[in-house]
Amino acid sequence: MSRRLGAAAAVLLLWLAVLTFALHGYYGGRLGSARRRNILLQHPALALHLPTRKMLLAVASFDDASSPSSLTTTDRHHHHHRHHGHHHHRGHDRWNRKGVPPTAAGPGEEVDPRFGVQKRLVPTGPNPLHH
């Protein structure tokens, strides 16, 4: 009798795990989402293989790739790679591009030319938190 009870408990736990995955893992806990229903109607094969988040990403990327503006987005991202020989971006790594000299204010009153705010003193030396 106890062996039969153990088997019934195992089957019950297995069914609960399957139902939990089906309701929360697969659908993300939102069974009545209108967008999901529309996606499933347009692409029914996705419902059998992909979890909800991956399904939405796959459909969104498929829609983005098929849109006419996707080509201009790709061109914009790869614009810099066409001009490897040109060096018209030389000033990007300099912190003081405009050449503004530091002000002659006293210590602690100096204005940072990058951010336009007063510079703060940074403590130097050993870290007091390390023993």
From Swiss-Prot:
Q: Does the keyword Transcription apply?
A: no
**Disordered, as annotated region:** 67-131
TM region(s), chain numbering:
none
The cross-references to InterPro entries, in alphabetical order and at most eight, read: CLE9-13
Keywords, in A-Z order: Developmental protein, Differentiation
What tissues contain this protein?
Expressed in all aerial apical meristems, including the floral and inflorescence meristems in the reproductive phase and the shoot apical meristem in the vegetative phase. Also detected in the primordia of lateral organs such as the leaf and the floral organs.
Single Gene Ontology BP term?
cell differentiation
Query: Bias category Basic residues: which stretches?
Result: 76-97
Is RNA-binding a UniProt keyword of this protein? no
Q: Which family does it belong to?
A: Belongs to the CLV3/ESR signal peptide family.
Q: What does this protein do?
A: Non functional suppressor of the fon2 mutation. In Oryza sativa subsp. japonica, the protein has a single amino acid substitution at the putative processing site of the signal peptide while in all the other varieties/species of domesticated and wild rice tested the protein is functional.
Family matches, as PANTHER family: CLAVATA3/ESR (CLE)-RELATED PROTEIN 10, INACTIVE PROTEIN FON2 SPARE1
The name this protein carries in UniProt is Inactive protein FON2 SPARE1
Organism encoding this protein:
Oryza sativa subsp. japonica
